[in-house]
Amino acid sequence: MATKKKTEKKVVEIFSTQSPNEAEQIAFQAQIKGFDVHFNAIVGGYCKVRSAVLDKEDAEQMVEKLAEEGFTANLLSI
């Protein structure tokens, strides 16, 4: 019986800010450029712009593409 290899999942976080307006603008700009990102609600006093949960390789590629477009992004383990 074949066992399914568990792939490592990551979240791409583009930006954290205390300004909801700033976070929404960043999410909007990234969406215009074709990135699947969304504005997260305020967590611990910070607004977050994140992408969905991705396989590690996909997340790393997204961070590279975001960097090419001028966005700073971090990989978060989950």
Where are the language model's segments positioned?
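Pro/Ala/Gly-rich low-complexity, hydrophilic intrinsically disordered segments
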Residues: 1-2
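Extracytoplasmic
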Residues: 5-8, 18-48, 52-78
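Targeting-peptide/extracellular-domain and disordered-appendage signature
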Residues: 13-14
